[in-house]
C-alpha cells in the first residue's frame, strides 16, 4: 500500500473502498524532516519547545543582563481571588509574588505580539497558496540564505510557499504552549517567564519572516533591491481635487485587489490611493520589483490616523488589521466617510456584506443607511472600495464634508477654553495645550502649530474637556499651512539584505571598521515628536553607521528635509553598506534585520544555521555591532520584536514611555565576574569589556539615546582599528549630547592602538594620572594597566560546548 504524506487526492465512482487516515496533521512536518536529512549539518535545537533554549542560552543571557522590573501598580487583578496587594514582598492568594506577576505581565505582552505576527503570516500564507499554489518559488533576491529565522528555528530551508507550512504550524503550536503558562496556577518564577519571553521573541521573528517572504515572492515586491523606487509621503502629496481612498492597517492582502481594479479600469491617475501604518508601506511595494513608476502614497504613521480623518479628505476608509484605532467608525461617521472592514480581526460590529450584490452594497453605504460594512471577499472589496470612493467624492464635496472647520468655528472653539488645565494633565506627551490656547485667544496660532508634530493624535485631551472643545481639530486647523507642505520621500521597502551585501560588509562589521548597524523600528509614541528619529538617523548616517528602518520609524525618517530640501532617503544610498540608509519594509520586515545579523554569522562566520540558535546568537553578541531603537514603541508587537532581537544578542533602546512594558535587561557593568567568556581555542576563561552593557533599556531623551546606542555597538571581538573607530564615535557623541567624557571609557582599552587616534596622547595621560596605568612615553605604548588582554585571534564564546576539546 502506498503512503500519502502531503498533497490532495479524490476518489470517484468506486465501491467498497476503505480509507485509513492516521497522522495527517503531522504529515507536513514528517515530509520536512525527511527533506532535512539532505541539508547537511544540523544544530542541537531544531523544532524547539518551551525549555529548549532555557539552559543552553537564555539563562546565560539573563545571568549577565538581569531583569529590572518596573511595575505599573502594586496589585494583581488576574483572577477571582484578587485583587491582591503584592507590595512589600507580599504574595497573592495564589502564591505569586510581585516579580512573578510582572514577569507574567511582560511575557503576556510578548506572546500577544508574537501571535499577532503569526496570525498575519498564517492569513497571508493561506491566501497566497490559494491564489498561486504551494509550488510558487520563494524568489527573494540574489541570495542562497532565504529564511534565516525559519532555518535557525526548524532546521529547514523552504524553497516554495508550501514548504513554509511546517514552520508556520510549529510557531502556532508553540504559541499555544506559551499561552497556557499564563493561566493562574502555572509558571510563577519571573526568570522563567523571561526565558519564555525570549523564546516567544524568537518565534515572533519566524512569524514576521513568513509574513514578508510570502508577500515578496507572490506579490512582486522589491527583492533585496537597494535602488527600490522613492515613494511620495505626507498629507501634502494628496491631490484634494481627486477622490481619495484611504487604507489603514498592516495586512496588504486586500489592498492589492483595489490596486488591480484601479489598474484594470485606468483609474490610477484619476483618484488617490494612500495609506497609514504598514499597509501604506506594503501597498507601495506591490509590483515594484521592476521599479515601475509608483502611484500610491504613504500618508504617515498611526499617530496620523485620527488627524487624517478629521481633515475630511478620505472619501472611503478601508481597515485591515493591527494598530488601527478603535474609534474610526464613529469619527468617520461624523464626516460621512464609509468604513469598510476587510479582515476578520477587526469587524467593528459592522454588517457583513460578502453575500450581497455589489451595487446594492455600494448604494447602502453611499446612502448612509449603514456607517460601514465587513467585506472579506477580496474580489468584491477591490471593486466596492474603488467605485464607492468615486461616488462618495462629489457627494461629500457638495455637503462640505471634505474640509476642516471654518475660521469662525475655530475662533468659537478657542474662545470657549476656560484654561482649567485638564487637557495638560491627561496628555501622554505633556503638551502645553493651555498655554497654546491662551495665545490663540490673542490671535497667535503659532503655539498650536508647534504642538502639531508632537501630538500623537490620541484624543485624550478632548475627553476631559468640560467645554467639549475638539482640541485635536483645533491643533490641525491651526496647522493647515504646515500640513499642506508635509511632503517627504521614502524608499519603498526593499526586503532582505542580500548574501552579496553580507559578504561585502561582514568583515567590516565583525572587525568593527564599520561602526555598527542602527535599526530604527517601531511605533510613533515619541516623547518629543517624530523629528527626533530624523536627528538620530542623520547623526549615525553622517558617521558611516549602517542605518536600517522599518514601519513607522522608516516613514518618519523621511518626513524631514535638510537646508537643501532633501530627505535622508535622497541624501544617502539604499544599500546595506557603510553610510547606507536601508528601508527594509513594514513591521513584518523586521525579521530581515535579525536575519542580516544571523547571515553574518552563517555566511561570513561559517556557523551552521540549521537548528542552531544559541551558537548564532553567541556569535552576534560577541562580534556583530548592532543596536535597535524603538523610540516610539507602544504596542505588544514592539515588545515581541525587541525581545526577539534580545535573544539574538542585539540590544535595543526604547523611548521614555517604554518603562510601561514593565521590564528592562541591564547588566552590572562593574561586576567583573559577569564579563568573562571562554576562548574557544583552549576553553580558558578570558575577560571582556562590558559590551554591550544592556539588552533592553529606556532613555529619557533622544540626546541621551544617541551615545547609548553608539556604545552598544562595541563588541568584544573588535580589532584595534575597529575599537578605536567605535570609541571615537561614542566619546564624541557623549561630549556633544551629554557633555564631558564617559566615566568608563578606559574599561574598553586593551592596547594603545584601541585609543582614538586624534586624542591618543591626551587619553594616555589620563590613563596614567587617573587610573595608574604604566605608560612608556618614549615608545608611546601602554606597559601595564588593562584588565583585558588583546589577542586578535581570540575566539570569545559564552558556550562551553564550542570550546576545543569540549
Swiss-Prot record:
Disulphide bridges, residue numbers: none
Residues given in the record as [4Fe-4S] cluster 3 binding sites: 417, 420, 423, 465
Amino-acid positions noted as binding [Ni-4Fe-4S] cluster in the UniProt annotation, renumbered to this chain: 250, 278, 323, 523, 552, 587
Database matches in SUPFAM superfamilies: alpha-helical ferredoxin (SSF46548), Prismane protein-like (SSF56821)
EC number(s) stated in the UniProt entry for this protein: 1.2.7.4
Domain 4Fe-4S ferredoxin-type residues, every copy: 407-436, 445-475
Gene Ontology BP annotations: acetyl-CoA metabolic process; methanogenesis, from acetate; response to hydrogen peroxide
Catalysed reactions, semicolon-separated: CO + 2 oxidized [2Fe-2S]-[ferredoxin] + H2O = 2 reduced [2Fe-2S]-[ferredoxin] + CO2 + 2 H(+)
Functional pathway: One-carbon metabolism; methanogenesis from acetate
Positions contributing to [4Fe-4S] cluster 2 binding: 76, 79, 84, 94
Binding site for CO: 117
Domain comment, as recorded: Cluster B is an all-cysteinyl-liganded 4Fe-4S cluster; cluster C is a mixed Ni-Fe-S cluster which is the active site of CO oxidation. Cluster D is also an all-cysteinyl-liganded 4Fe-4S cluster that bridges the two subunits of the CODH dimer. Contains two additional 4Fe-4S clusters, dubbed E and F, that probably transport electrons from ferredoxin to the B cluster.
Its job: Part of the ACDS complex that catalyzes the reversible cleavage of acetyl-CoA, allowing growth on acetate as sole source of carbon and energy. The alpha-epsilon subcomponent functions as a carbon monoxide dehydrogenase.
NCBIfam families, sorted: cdhA (TIGR00314)
The name this protein goes by in its record: Acetyl-CoA decarbonylase/synthase complex subunit alpha 1
Record organism: Methanosarcina thermophila
Upper taxonomic lineage: Archaea, Methanobacteriati, Methanobacteriota, Stenosarchaea group, Methanomicrobia
Amino acid at each position: 500500500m502506498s503512503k500519502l504524506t502531503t498533497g490532495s487526492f479524490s476518489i470517484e465512482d468506486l465501491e467498497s473502498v476503505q480509507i485509513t487516515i492516521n497522522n495527517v496533521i503531522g504529515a507536513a512536518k514528517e515530509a520536512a524532516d525527511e527533506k532535512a536529512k539532505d541539508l547537511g549539518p544540523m544544530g542541537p535545537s531544531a523544532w524547539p519547545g518551551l525549555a529548549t533554549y532555557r539552559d543552553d542560552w537564555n539563562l546565560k543571557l539573563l545571568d549577565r543582563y538581569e531583569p529590572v522590573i518596573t511595575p505599573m501598580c502594586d496589585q494583581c487583578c488576574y483572577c477571582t481571588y484578587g485583587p491582591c496587594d503584592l507590595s512589600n514582598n507580599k504574595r497573592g492568594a495564589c502564591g505569586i509574588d510581585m516579580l512573578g506577576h510582572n514577569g507574567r505581565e511582560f511575557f503576556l505582552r510578548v506572546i500577544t505580539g508574537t501571535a499577532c505576527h503569526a496570525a498575519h503570516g498564517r492569513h497571508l500564507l493561506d491566501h497566497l497558496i490559494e491564489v498561486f499554489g504551494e509550488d510558487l518559488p520563494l524568489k527573494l533576491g540574489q541570495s542562497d540564505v532565504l529564511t534565516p529565522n525559519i532555518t535557525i528555528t526548524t532546521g529547514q530551508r523552504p524553497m516554495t510557499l508550501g514548504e513554509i507550512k511546517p514552520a508556520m504550524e510549529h510557531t502556532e503550536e508553540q504559541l499555544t504552549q506559551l499561552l497556557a503558562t499564563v493561566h493562574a496556577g502555572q509558571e510563577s518564577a519571573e526568570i522563567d517567564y523571561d526565558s519564555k519571553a525570549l523564546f516567544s521573541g524568537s518565534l515572533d521573528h519566524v512569524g514576521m519572516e513568513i509574513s514578508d517572504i510570502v508577500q515578496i515572492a507572490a506579490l512582486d515586491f522589491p527583492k533585496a533591491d537597494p535602488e527600490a523606487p522613492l515613494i511620495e509621503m505626507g498629507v501634502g502629496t494628496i491631490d484634494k481635487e481627486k477622490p481619495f481612498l484611504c487604507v489603514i492597517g498592516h495586512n496588504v492582502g486586500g489592498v492589492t485587489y483595489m490596486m488591480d481594479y484601479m489598474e484594470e479600469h485606468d483609474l490610477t491617475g484619476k483618484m488617490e490611493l494612500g495609506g497609514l501604518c504598514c499597509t501604506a508601506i506594503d501597498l507601495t511595494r506591490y509590483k515594484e520589483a521592476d521599479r515601475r513608476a509608483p502611484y500610491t502614497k504613504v500618508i504617515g504613521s498611526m499617530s496620523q490616523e485620527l488627524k487624517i480623518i478629521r481633515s475630511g479628505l478620505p472619501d472611503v476608509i478601508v481597515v485591515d488589521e493591527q494598530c488601527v484605532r478603535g474609534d474610526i467608525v464613529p469619527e468617520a461617521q461624523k464626516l460621512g466617510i464609509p468604513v469598510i472592514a476587510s479582515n476578520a480581526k477587526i469587524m467593528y460590529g459592522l454588517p457583513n456584506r460578502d453575500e450581497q450584490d455589489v451595487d446594492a452594497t455600494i448604494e447602502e453605504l453611499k446612502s448612509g443607511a449603514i456607517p460601514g460594512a465587513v467585506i472579506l471577499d477580496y474580489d468584491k472589496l477591490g471593486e466596492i472600495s474603488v467605485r464607492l470612493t468615486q461616488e462618495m467624492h462629489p457627494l461629500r464635496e457638495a455637503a462640505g464634508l471634505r474640509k476642516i472647520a471654518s475660521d469662525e468655528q475655530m475662533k468659537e472653539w478657542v474662545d470657549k477654553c476656560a484654561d482649567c488645565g485638564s487637557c495638560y494633565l491627561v496628555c501622554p506627551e505633556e503638551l502645553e495645550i493651555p498655554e497654546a490656547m491662551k495665545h490663540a485667544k490673542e490671535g497667535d496660532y503659532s503655539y498650536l502649530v508647534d504642538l502639531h508634530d508632537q501630538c500623537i493624535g490620541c484624543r485624550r485631551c478632548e475627553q476631559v474637556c468640560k467645554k467639549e472643545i475638539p482640541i485635536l481639530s483645533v491643533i490641525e486647523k491651526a496647522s493647515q499651512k504646515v500640513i499642506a507642505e508635509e511632503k517627504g520621500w521614502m524608499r519603498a521597502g526593499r526586503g532582505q539584505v542580500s548574501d552579496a551585501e553580507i559578504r561585502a560588509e561582514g568583515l567590516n562589521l565583525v572587525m568593527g571598521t564599520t561602526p555598527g548597524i542602527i535599526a530604527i523600528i517601531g511605533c510613533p509614541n515619541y516623547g518629543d515628536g517624530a523629528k527626533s528619529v530624523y536627528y538620530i538617523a542623520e547623526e549615525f548616517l553622517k558617521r558611516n553607521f549602517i542605518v536600517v528602518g522599518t514601519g513607522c520609524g522608516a516613514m518618519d525618517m523621511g518626513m524631514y528635509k535638510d537646508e537643501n530640501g532633501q530627505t535622508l532617503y535622497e541624501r544617502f544610498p539604499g544599500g546595506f553598506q557603510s553610510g547606507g540608509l536601508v528601508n527594509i519594509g513594514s513591521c513584518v520586515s523586521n525579521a530581515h534585520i535579525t536575519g542580516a545579523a544571523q547571515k553574518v554569522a552563517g555566511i561570513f562566520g561559517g556557523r551552521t544555521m540549521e537548528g542552531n540558535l544559541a551558537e548564532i546568537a553567541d556569535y552576534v553578541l560577541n562580534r556583530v555591532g548592532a543596536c535597535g531603537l524603538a523610540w516610539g514603541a507602544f504596542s505588544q508587537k514592539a515588545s515581541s520584536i525587541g525581545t526577539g532581537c534580545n535573544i539574538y544578542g542585539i540590544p535595543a533602546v526604547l523611548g521614555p514611555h517604554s518603562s510601561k512594558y514593565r521590564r528592562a535587561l541591564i547588566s552590572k557593568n562593574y561586576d567583573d565576574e559577569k564579563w568573562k567568556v571562554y576562548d574557544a581555542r583552549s576553553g580558558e576563561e578570558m575577560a571582556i569589556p562590558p559590551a554591550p552593557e544592556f539588552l533592553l533599556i529606556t532613555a529619557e531623551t533622544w540626546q541621551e539615546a544617541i551615545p547609548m546606542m553608539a556604545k552598544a555597538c562595541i563588541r568584544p571581538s573588535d580589532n584595534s582599528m575597529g575599537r578605536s573607530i567605535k570609541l571615537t564615535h561614542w566619546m564624541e557623541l557623549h561630549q556633544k549630547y551629554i557633555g564631558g567624557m564617559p566615566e568608563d571609557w578606559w574599561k574598553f582599552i586593551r592596547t594603545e592602538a584601541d585609543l582614538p587616534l586624534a586624542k591618543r596622547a591626551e587619553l594616555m595621560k589620563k590613563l596614567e594620572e587617573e587610573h595608574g596605568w604604566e605608560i612608556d612615553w618614549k615608545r608611546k605604548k601602554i606597559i601595564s594597566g588593562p584588565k583585558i588582554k588583546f589577542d586578535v585571534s581570540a575566539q570569545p564564546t559564552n558556550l562551553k560546548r564550542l570550546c576545543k576539546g569540549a
